[in-house]
Amino acid sequence: MFLINLLLLIVPVLLAVAFLTLIERKILGYMQFRKGPNIVGPHGLLQPIADAVKLFIKEPLRPLTSSIYMFILAPILALSLALTIWVPLPMPLPLIDLNLGLLFILSVSGLSVYSILWSGWASNSKYALTGALRAVAQTISYEVTLAIILLSIMLINGSFTLTTLNLTQEFMWLVVPTWPLMLMWFISTLAETNRAPFDLTEGESELVSGFNVEYAAGPFAMFFLAEYANIIIMNALTVILFFGTYHLIFLPELSTTNFMVKTMLLTSLFLWVRASYPRFRYDQLMHLLWKNFLPITLVTCLWYIMFPTMLSGTPPQM
C-alpha cells in the first residue's frame, strides 16, 4: 500500500516537471516574440515526451578520464534527493507526517549540492569543476539565510511540523506580517535552485554548460528533472510557509486545488524572472547575501524572539 502511495506521489511530480519544461519554453518564446515549441503534437503539447524518448534512447557517453562510479551516481543522487523532499509536504495530507518536517526539507536540499560537486569532480573537466565549485559556494551561502528565515517562521508557528502551518494561517497568511522575509526567501530560493539571475553554475557564456557539460542522454535528463523538481518543491514550500493552503474557509475540500494554483503562479514568476533579468556577477551574488540578506534576516529573527518575550507579562486585552 505504501508503495502505491509513493508512486501516486512520484509519477505526478515527474509529469509536472515534464510539462514545466514545455511551459517555460512557451513563456520564454512569447516573451521573445516567437512561438516556442508548436510542431510535436497539438500546440507542441507532446514536446516533453519526445524530448524524454530522445534522451533516454541515446547512448550515455562519458569521458575516458572520468571517475565512472561517481560520474553515474551523481545524477541518480540528484533525482532521488529531489523526489525525497516531497515526502513530508502536506497536500493537504503528507505521505509521512514528520515532526521535524522543515528540518528534513532543509537538510535534504543541502545534500543536493553533493551531486553537483560529484558530477563536476568526476567529469575531470575544468569547466565542470568550476561550475561545481561555484554551486557549492552559492548553495552553502544561501542555505544560511533560508535557515534563519525558517527559524523566524517557526517562532511564529510554534512548531517544526508543516501541517500546523495550515492551522496558523487559517485567518491570515503569514506573508502579511512577514513580507520582507517572504521577498528574501523568494530570492534565496532562486539562488538555491541555481535559476536565473543566479545561474552561475551553468553560465553558458563562460562555462559552456557548467557542472553537467560532460553529461549526455539519460544522466543529463536526470539532472534536468532534478533541477525542475527542485523548482516546484521550493515554490510549494513558499506556498505552505507564507500563503496558507487552508485559506478557503467555506470550501476546505478545495485546499489541494488552492495549493496547486498558488504553486503554479509562483513557478510562473520564476520563469518570468528568467526572461527578464541578466545573470548576476559572482561577487555581486555573494555581496547580496553576506552584506544585505544575512544582517536583515538576523535582525528580524531577533525581533520575532524579542516581541513575544516583551509582551509575555502583559494581561490579555479585551
From Swiss-Prot:
Spans traversing the lipid bilayer: 3-23, 68-88, 100-120, 144-164, 171-191, 231-251, 254-276, 293-313
Catalyzed reactions: a ubiquinone + NADH + 5 H(+)(in) = a ubiquinol + NAD(+) + 4 H(+)(out)
Keyword Metal-binding tagged: no
GO MF term set: NADH dehydrogenase (ubiquinone) activity
Key words, A-Z: Electron transport, Membrane, Mitochondrion, Mitochondrion inner membrane, NAD, Respiratory chain, Translocase, Transmembrane, Transmembrane helix, Transport, Ubiquinone
GO cellular component, one term: mitochondrial inner membrane
Membrane-topology annotation of the record: Multi-pass membrane protein
Subcellular location: Mitochondrion inner membrane
Presence of keyword Membrane: yes
EC assignment: 7.1.1.2
A GO BP entry: aerobic respiration
A Pfam family that the UniProt record links to this protein: NADHdh
Family, similarity comment: Belongs to the complex I subunit 1 family.
Record-linked PANTHER family: NADH DEHYDROGENASE SUBUNIT 1 (PTHR11432), NADH-UBIQUINONE OXIDOREDUCTASE CHAIN 1 (PTHR11432:SF3)
Protein function: Core subunit of the mitochondrial membrane respiratory chain NADH dehydrogenase (Complex I) that is believed to belong to the minimal assembly required for catalysis. Complex I functions in the transfer of electrons from NADH to the respiratory chain. The immediate electron acceptor for the enzyme is believed to be ubiquinone.
Protein's UniProt name: NADH-ubiquinone oxidoreductase chain 1
